[in-house]
Amino acid sequence: MYKTILSTLFFAGIFGVTTLQAQEAINSVRFGDNGVVYLEDFEHYDVGSIPDEWYNRDGNNIPATYDELYRNDYKYKVVQEDAKKFLRYEGTEAKHLNFPLIDKKEINIFETPILKWDWRIFDIPEGGDEDSSSQNDVAASVYVVFDTSRILFQKIPVTIRYTWSSKYPVGSIFSKLRGRQKIMVIGTGENNLGKWQTFERNLVEDYKNIFGKTPPRTPIAILILSDADDTRSHIKADYDDFELHPAR
């Protein structure tokens, strides 16, 4: 997938456009009376479209507005089954989608620390290895990005990336970008392929456990990525119902 230098540019890029995100990001985040923050359920998008509230990896453009040639590089589209809409990735190439939260100051993960979402994995990239720079493919992953500090006058975030792994056991943790990205395996292998599964992660606890300190109260973005470009596999995965919940 992306080599180290590109990964570094990725994280620098997110912070290079945070002002733009704060000024322009418009999304359908809803705050329920039950304390739940409803981030995204894909229900209000047209079937077959790239959701227009999701940005490119660096957060400075919206793929849904691209010319067709460039828009087709993004293998994500809204799909409907019965009454349910969701986001599907189907392809090989790696493209992130970025759901900005930097302007959602009402979000406080100390009040709603549980990130909950559904995904459905159909294929895993054979030989995918998220701990390798040359085979770094995963069927599905969710990044939670936090604004924390500056390095040499450049803002560099820290990120937790939750993955469905081709090979590693659940609970495996890997470190990238000099420890500023932590990869946590939460699903693995071919078990339950083709079935919707719900995952919940306590962001505050995970952050404290893997970074050893307290997180900022509001993430700056959630990103998703499915890719199989290093292994040249063809994969399919679905995403839906991103929410933040109070602690159980």
Language model features with spans:
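Short edge-strand/loop segments of extracellular domains
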Residues: 132-152
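Solvent-exposed strand-to-loop "edge" motifs in beta-rich extracellular domains
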Residues: 118-124, 147-149, 204, 227
